[in-house]
Structures are given as structure tokens and as C-alpha cells.
């Protein structure tokens, strides 16, 4: 009979009891039976248990992959996890009222932290393989997109990450059962999986292993329990042989007891943890013995200045030692400051403790190249400002590094404290720059850190006020330079309004502040570096506010370009930034030639990004070592101080176009013409070599297309390529007064197109009407007259002006196109002949010019001669032959030149 029908009813189960017993064989028997006869112990689990077990197994896999940083497998496991969670959603909605299980939120939070940690490690990311790097980007995007639906749950989890929910208790129970099952499998007995307890229900007693047989036989009647109790011996032993075999029920019972004990222990742990959470926060236990926090003073000790100073010296004596707890050191100093304030030990003692707190915060980060933590940064700003306010409020406190420790005074005024607030604020400024460099410039973190510049500048102002009251000239120059470096690159619109008279003349602007600070440094500084940096920053600030002549005069009078190569790298970077901004200023002030001269050194190298310290270009393997790359990264400028490289390149190319195109037209047939801009010339030539040129898309293509239009004298097409919607968005709208710049560009394009047109087509015209030229290029007649007059005066255009008729009369002094080509051809042929003769002489040598003409028979005679005097007769013969050959070659050259002149005259006559 089928096993399914064996327990159909009470009567059937009673009548077929023998048949059922015949199938209840133990797996541990000595004989193997078929699958139909072998007993299989099973547990009927709910859908929730199955789904949760699937989720926990995938989460375990993800954690294992994270440990070994196997990112591709982490990505595939994450995709499996999302699919498994989607399948479990109906169960979660029913059982958990739609609340996401906490263990799932924990997995998402851990995965997000892991991705952020790997992503922020830029050095480690470079060493990743191509597959890992690609998988990391994909995983980051998918996780960021996926966790948007769990933002509230994640935020609640991060507030209390150590709290565990009932669902996590179930997961722990599942994991413990899985571990026990592994133990049972070793003993040869197939384990029975215990079902975890349901959420929010009382724990039920674990059923014995033998009771599960009713589930295996699928006996659905409730009376089966009584039947099994009445026939214990018959159900336990199926045949006579099995009565005398070794019993396995004792071991199974022990295993069940073990499972029960483990579950009880787990519940007790969870209960204790919940009680501890109610009592207070967790404390991290240090490996080894627990280090107690040292007591500051004895209970009955009298707190006075010597005692506090001795305690301060004791705390700071551990500074820099190997096993010093730097966090504890900072906490002790803060506690000592509070004790000092409570007992009114004086402002001088408080200032001393403040300064030591600042030193301890700086010491916390052992690697000076890495930025400090944000919590320490906020603490540093607060302590620094507090110390400077105390110094400014008490004029009788003198704090200087020149004060010796034995001469410090804390009891009677004037108070002397050893310390250097200038060095502290300089380190503060450097740490601020490190924090900015560490952040992603396109993220909100960078904006948040940039807001701290207000507090940094405020701190610098406090230090500046203190040293203006009591400080040496050198100290004042150093703090002035720090303020200048936070001011020189910032644009002040009040400066231009003051120029136009829109604000009162007494209004103080950033230019006035820069003048005051820089002039003091020019007069009082005794170090070249501070003065040089102040001049460069001063020029940069003038150029930013269109003070072209002041900036140019400072450059010329300081002779910076002569000795800048001997400066340090940071000063050379500032010099490059100054030249770039000076070029932009010259361009805005219609000085195209000066703009080109300022930018040519930067752009001709092809590495303006590196020269301006705005990023590193990818190098070949051995061109830059890891140490050099690290040093260059430390020299990079923060993102908010960058100069737009596309704007810089566009200004350079447009300036080169306005200079180069008229020059090319004027020297079209000159074989020895020089290039004004090598970069622009290469761009133009590469475009001309292309067989098919489409419409321009990039900024460079727009400039090249405009140059081609200008060569034909078509100013309208040239202006449309330079000034259009796309170029306005990319380049011209970045200027302060963009409309004025666009008008200036259009005017220059008209003028240079006119000059190009006259150079190109002067041999076609006999005379040209000036009013028609003015109408063609939409320029005033006086302006056209002025342009042509300059060309005639500079001997660029061979023509004369006829004022009564307002025409330009062309003089045919230039060779025609055919004549120019013929002369060009003759020059090239001449050069070719000279080169061939030189090559022939190099290959032949002077073998046939020797005295013996290559005859080897005289070697014995020469060998017998006195070698001290040498073969003077042969040497004289060789010298005479060489002179004769040189005279013949010179005569041949003269004859060749005469023939060329005759050919040119013949061509002219024809």
C-alpha cells in the first residue's frame, strides 16, 4: 500500500500498523535498503523560515566576499540578495507588518560602508584589476540606487547599530541550528532541523526526535499521538534484529539537549545585552588588562598654579612616546583646563593649557601628509579662537617662542608664556588645505569644508591683530602673507563699481587691503620668498580686477621672470597662475599680443594642468615614481582656486588666430617665415590634412573653423564660429562682463579680417575704395583709413592713399603669384643640391685626395720613415689638394647663382 494512504483514517492506521512499522528502518542499520524503505527525517518549515534562511545564507556569502575584497562576486551576491528579498516581500508584509528585518538593514549598511571605504582609498583603487574596478563602479551605483528605498530604516539603524531585533534573534537561532546539524552529520545520523520560534510568540518545548516520525508518515489525524504512546516497543523496534543493535536514541537525545542549551544561552545573552543597553552605553575593552583613566589630583589636594603646571608637564612629557594614548591625552588636557577655570588660576595658565591642547591635537595624526579627522578639526578651530580671544583680551600676557621655559611667569603681571601662535595658525591653514584636497570637489562635503574658511580667516585675523600689537616685522610679514593667500584669488565686484563711480570713493575694497599688506611686506621683509609670493599675489589680484597697467608694471619692475627658476615649486606654481591670469586680463583689455605672450609658455608645453597644479596627467610607467607622484599631489591647488583650462586655451587660440592668420597671408610665399604660435599652427595643419571636415563641435574645432573663414576675409562666418551659443556657454559667459568681451572680439575679428583680405587680394586690385571696404566690414571709414595707413607705414602693404577719391592705389612691387612660386621652386632646388653634395662628401670621405691616391705599395716606405716628424711631404700634398677642391667648389656655387639670376630675369621678361 502507498505510504500516503497508510494514515488515511484511524481505522486504516490501526489495521495497517504492521505495514507502517515495516518501513521505519533506521539509517544506521548494517544493511542498506532502497529509498522507498529508508526512513527520511524531515521538518515541515514555514515559508517565512525558508525565505529568512535563504536571505541569511546570501548575507553570509556577501560577508565572506567582502573579507577578501572579491568585488565581482560581491556584486553577483548582492543581485541574488535583492531577488531573494523580493521573493520574501509577501512574507514580510504578512508576518512583520511590512517592517524590513533588521538583519537585512544591517547587511545593507555594512555593504554601503564597505563600498565607501574602498572607494575613498584612491591608492588602493589604482591597484585594483580592471574587472574589480569595473565591478566596484557598478556595485556602487546599484547599491546607492537600491538603498534609497531604505533611507529611513538605515538612519534608524545607524542611530543604534548595536540593538538587535527579534528577527535577528531568529537568524541567530537558524545559524546555531545549522552548526549543530553539521556536528550531527559527522556521527552518521541524519539530523533533524529544529524550526525557529515564531516572532512574538511564547517559546515552545522542543519535540523529541522520535515524535517527528508522525510528520514523515504524513499522518494528519490528531489521534496518532495516543496510538504511538500505546505501542512504544513496537514502534521503536521494527524487527528482532534491530532489538539487539546499538541504540542511537541516546545520542540523538544528547544532541537535542545541546541544541536546547545553546538556544537558552543565546536568549540569555540577548536578554543581558538588552539590559545593558538600558543601563548605559557599551565600553570598548582594550586588549589585555583594562587601563583605568588616571586620576588628575588627589581628593584632598590643594589646587594651585604650580600643581596644575606640574600636572601639565606630566601629561605633555608622554608626548611622542610609543604607547601614549593620544585621545586620552587630549581628554586629560581638557579636564585640566576645566579644573583651572573652576579654581580661577589665571588667564595665563589657561592660555598655556590651550596651546598644549592645540599641540596635542596636531600630534594625534602621526602621518603629516594625511588630513586630520573632522571632529579634531572642529575642536582645533574652537580652541584656537578661544586662545586668541584670551590673548587679545589681556594685554599683559606675552606669548612668544623667544620666552625660555625658566622665564615663564603665571602669577604676577606681566605674564610670560612660551609658545608660538603664528606657527599654530600656519599649521591650521595647512590642515585646512589638506581637508579640501581630500574631499571630492563635486560633492557636498567639499562645500561644507569650504564654509570653514570663514572661521579660518577669522582666526588669522585674530592672530594678525595680536602681532600688530606685539610682534616683530618678520612675524607680521608671515601672518600678512597668510591673509594675502586667502584674499588674492577672490573677485571683488566693488572694485569695478568704484572705478565706474557707482560707489563712494572712500569705500574700502580688497585691492586697498592688498595694497596695504603687500607694501608692508615690500618694505619690511628680509626674506626673498615672502616678498616674491606677495608680489605674485598682488599682480594676480590686480589682473583679476582689470588693473592691466599696474599689474604689467609690477611684473616688469620686479624682474620675476629672470630668477623665478631658482624659486621653490610652490612659488613657481604661483608664478604660472599669475601669468595665466595676467594673460586673461590682457585679453579683456584688448591687448591681444600681450595676452598671447603671457600664455604661450604655459600652452606650448601641452601641460598647463600640471604647471598650474590643477591635476596630474597620466604618465608612462617609469616617468614618475610613486614618491614623486605623492609629492606632486601634495602641491595641488584646492578645486575652488582652479583656473578654467578650457577658457585659458580658448583665449590663447583666439589670440594666436588674430595674430597668425594676417601674418600667414602677408608671408604666403616666404619659405623662411616663422610661426608665431606652434600649437595653433599644428591645429590648423591637422585640420587641413583631413579629407572630410564636419561641422565644429569642440572649442578647438570652432577656433580652427573661424581661422579658415578669416583666411578668406569672411569676417561674419569667423565671428559666428567664435561667438555663438555653445561657445558662450563654454567660454565667454565665464567672464565678468561677458557682453563687453564679445563686442571686443567681434571688433578685432573685423579688423584682422580686413588686414587679411588686403594681404591676400592686393595683387588683384589696382585700387580699392575705402568706403566700400568700410561697408564690407561694417567699420567706420576713419577706422579703415587708420588700419590701411598703419599697414603702409609699416611697409606691410605696398600702396598709397588718394585722399580726394578715398581710394587705395596698389603698387605692383611684389612679385606675381607665378613669379613667387618660381622663386620658391628655385630655392628648394638649390637647397636640395647642397644637401646631396654634403651627403656625397660624407660617404666618400678624403680617400682619393691622399698623396698616394690609394696606392698601398708605399706603406713599407712610409713605415721606414721617422714617424716623429710625420710624412710632411704627403701632408703638404693633401693640404694643397683640399685647397684646390674648395676653390673649385666655391666657383661652382658662384656660377650656379648667376644661372639662377638669369633664369629669374628670363621669367620676368616672359
From Swiss-Prot:
Q: Does the keyword Cell membrane apply?
A: no
Positions in coiled-coil regions:
none
Keyword Acyltransferase part of the UniProt annotation: no
Give every PCI domain span: 639-815
Q: Where is the composition biased (Low complexity)?
A: 188-207, 862-874, 895-910
Could you tell me where this protein is found in the cell? Cytoplasm
**Name the record gives this protein:** Eukaryotic translation initiation factor 3 subunit C
Keyword tags: Cytoplasm, Initiation factor, Phosphoprotein, Protein biosynthesis
Give a GO biological-process term: formation of cytoplasmic translation initiation complex
> Which InterPro entries does its entry note?
EIF3C (IPR027516), EIF3C_N_dom (IPR008905), PCI_dom (IPR000717), WH_DNA-bd_sf (IPR036390)
Subunit structure, briefly? Component of the eukaryotic translation initiation factor 3 (eIF-3) complex. The eIF-3 complex interacts with pix.
Q: Where is this region: Disordered?
A: 1-21, 157-279, 847-910
Q: Where is the composition biased (Acidic residues)?
A: 11-20, 162-186, 209-235
**Molecular function terms, GO-annotated:** RNA binding; translation initiation factor activity; translation initiation factor binding
Q: Which SMART domains match?
A: PINT (SM00088)
Gene Ontology cellular-component terms for this entry are: eukaryotic 43S preinitiation complex; eukaryotic 48S preinitiation complex; eukaryotic translation initiation factor 3 complex
Bias (Basic residues): 882-891
Which N-terminal residues, if any, form the signal peptide? none
Amino acid at each position: 500500500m502507498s505510504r500516503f494512504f497508510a494514515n488515511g483514517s484511524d481505522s486504516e492506521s490501526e489495521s495497517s500498523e504492521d505495514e507502517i512499522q515495516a518501513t521505519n528502518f533506521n539509517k544506521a542499520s548494517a544493511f542498506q535498503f532502497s529509498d522507498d524503505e529508508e526512513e527520511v527525517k524531515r521538518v515541515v518549515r514555514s515559508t517565512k523560515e525558508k525565505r529568512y534562511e535563504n536571505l541569511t545564507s546570501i548575507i553570509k556569502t556577501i560577508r565572506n566576499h567582502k573579507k577578501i575584497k572579491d568585488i565581482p562576486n560581491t556584486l553577483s551576491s548582492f543581485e541574488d540578495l535583492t531577488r531573494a528579498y523580493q521573493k520574501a516581500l509577501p512574507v514580510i508584509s504578512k508576518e512583520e507588518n511590512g517592517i524590513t528585518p533588521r538583519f537585512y538593514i544591517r547587511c545593507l549598511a555594512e555593504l554601503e560602508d564597505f563600498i565607501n571605504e574602498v572607494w575613498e582609498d584612491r591608492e588602493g583603487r589604482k591597484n585594483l584589476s580592471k574587472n574589480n574596478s569595473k565591478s566596484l563602479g557598478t556595485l556602487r551605483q546599484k547599491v546607492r540606487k537600491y538603498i534609497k528605498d531604505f533611507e529611513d530604516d538605515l538612519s534608524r539603524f545607524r542611530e543604534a547599530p548595536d540593538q538587535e531585533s527579534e528577527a535577528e534573534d531568529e537568524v541567530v537561532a537558524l545559524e546555531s541550528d545549522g552548526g549543530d546539524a553539521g556536528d550531527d552529520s559527522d556521527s552518521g545520523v541524519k539530523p533533524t532541523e529544529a524550526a525557529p520560534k515564531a516572532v512574538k510568540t511564547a517559546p515552545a518545548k522542543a519535540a523529541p526526535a522520535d515524535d517527528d516520525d508522525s510528520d514523515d508518515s504524513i499522518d494528519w489525524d490528531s489521534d496518532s499521538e495516543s496510538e504511538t504512546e500505546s505501542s512504544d516497543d513496537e514502534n521503536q523496534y521494527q524487527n528482532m534484529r534491530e532489538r539487539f543493535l546499538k541504540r542511537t536514541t541516546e545520542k540523538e537525545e544528547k544532541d537535542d539537549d545541546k541544541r536546547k542549551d545553546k538556544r537558552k544561552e543565546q536568549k540569555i545573552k540577548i536578554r543581558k545585552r538588552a539590559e545593558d543597553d538600558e543601563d548605559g552605553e557599551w565600553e570598548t575593552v582594550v586588549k589585555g588588562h583594562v587601563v583605568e583613566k588616571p586620576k588628575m589630583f588627589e581628593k584632598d589636594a590643594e589646587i594651585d598654579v604650580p600643581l596644575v603646571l606640574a600636572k601639565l608637564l606630566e601629561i605633555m612629557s608622554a608626548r611622542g612616546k610609543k604607547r601614549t594614548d593620544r585621545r586620552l591625552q587630549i581628554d586629560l588636557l581638557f579636564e585640566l583646563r576645566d579644573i583651572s577655570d573652576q579654581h580661577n588660576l589665571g588667564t595665563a595658565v589657561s592660555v598655556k593649557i590651550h596651546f598644549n591642547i592645540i599641540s596635542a591635537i596636531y600630534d594625534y595624526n602621526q602621518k603629516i601628509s594625511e588630513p586630520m579627522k573632522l571632529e579634531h578639526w572642529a575642536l582645533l578651530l574652537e580652541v584656537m579662537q578661544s586662545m586668541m580671544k584670551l590673548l587679545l583680551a589681556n594685554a599683559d600676557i606675552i606669548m612668544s617662542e623667544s620666552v625660555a621655559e625658566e622665564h615663564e611667569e603665571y602669577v604676577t603681571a606681566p605674564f610670560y608664556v612660551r609658545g608660538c601662535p603664528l606657527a599654530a595658525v600656519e599649521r591650521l591653514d595647512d590642515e585646512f588645505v589638506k581637508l579640501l584636497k581630500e574631499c571630492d570637489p563635486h560633492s557636498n562635503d567639499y562645500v561644507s569644508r569650504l564654509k570653514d574658511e570663514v572661521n579660518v580667516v577669522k582666526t588669522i585675523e585674530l592672530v594678525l591683530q595680536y602681532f600688530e600689537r606685539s610682534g616683530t616685522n618678520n612675524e607680521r610679514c608671515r601672518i600678512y602673507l597668510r591673509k594675502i593667500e586667502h584674499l588674492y584669488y577672490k573677485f571683488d565686484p566693488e572694485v569695478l563699481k568704484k572705478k565706474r563711480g557707482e560707489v563712494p570713493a572712500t569705500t574700502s575694497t580688497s585691492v586697498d587691503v592688498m595694497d596695504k599688506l603687500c607694501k608692508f611686506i615690500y618694505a619690511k621683509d628680509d626674506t626673498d620668498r615672502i616678498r616674491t609670493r606677495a608680489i605674485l599675489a598682488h599682480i594676480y589680484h590686480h589682473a583679476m580686477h582689470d588693473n592691466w597697467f599696474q599689474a604689467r608694471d609690477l611684473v616688469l619692475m620686479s624682474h620675476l621672470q629672470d630668477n623665478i627658476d631658482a624659486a621653490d615649486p610652490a612659488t613657481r606654481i604661483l608664478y604660472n597662475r599669475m601669468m595665466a591670469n595676467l594673460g586673461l586680463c590682457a585679453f579683456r583689455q584688448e591687448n591681444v599680443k600681450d595676452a598671447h605672450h603671457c600664455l604661450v609658455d604655459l600652452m606650448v608645453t601641452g601641460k598647463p594642468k600640471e604647471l598650474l597644479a590643477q591635476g596630474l596627467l597620466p604618465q608612462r610607467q617609469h616617468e614618475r615614481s610613486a614618491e614623486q607622484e605623492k609629492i606632486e599631489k601634495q602641491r595641488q591647488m584646492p578645486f575652488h582656486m582652479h583656473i578654467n583650462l578650457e577658457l585659458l586655451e580658448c583665449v590663447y587660440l583666439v589670440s594666436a588666430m588674430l595674430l597668425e592668420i594676417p601674418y600667414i597671408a602677408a608671408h604666403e610665399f616666404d619659405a623662411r617665415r616663422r610661426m608665431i604660435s606652434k600649437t595653433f599652427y599644428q591645429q590648423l595643419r591637422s585640420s587641413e590634412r583631413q579629407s572630410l571636415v564636419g561641422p565644429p563641435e569642440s572649442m578647438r574645432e570652432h577656433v580652427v573653423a573661424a581661422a579658415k573663414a578669416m583666411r578668406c576675409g569672411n569676417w561674419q562666418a569667423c565671428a559666428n564660429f567664435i561667438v555663438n551659443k555653445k561657445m558662450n556657454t563654454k567660454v565667454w559667459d565665464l567672464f565678468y562682463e561677458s557682453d563687453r568681451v564679445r563686442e571686443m572680439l567681434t571688433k578685432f575679428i573685423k579688423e584682422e579680417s580686413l588686414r587679411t583680405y588686403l594681404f591676400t587680394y592686393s595683387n588683384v586690385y589696382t585700387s580699392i575704395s575705402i568706403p566700400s571696404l568700410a561697408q564690407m566690414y561694417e567699420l567706420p571709414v576713419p577706422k579703415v583709413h587708420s588700419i590701411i595707413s598703419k599697414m603702409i607705414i609699416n611697409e606691410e602693404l605696398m600702396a598709397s592713399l588718394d585722399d580726394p577719391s578715398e581710394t587705395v592705389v596698389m603698387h605692383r612691387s611684389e612679385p606675381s603669384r607665378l613669379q613667387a612660386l618660381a622663386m620658391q621652386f628655385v630655392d628648394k632646388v638649390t637647397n636640395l643640391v647642397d644637401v646631396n653634395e654634403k651627403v656625397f662628401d660624407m660617404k666618400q670621405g678624403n680617400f682619393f685626395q691622399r698623396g698616394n691616391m690609394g696606392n698601398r705599395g708605399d706603406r713599407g716606405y712610409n713605415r721606414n720613415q721617422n714617424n716623429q716628424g710625420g710624412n710632411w711631404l704627403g701632408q703638404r700634398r693633401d693640404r694643397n689638394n683640399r685647397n684646390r677642391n674648395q676653390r673649385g667648389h666655391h666657383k661652382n656655387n658662384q656660377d650656379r647663382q648667376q644661372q639662377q639670376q638669369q633664369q629669374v630675369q628670363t621669367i620676368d621678361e616672359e
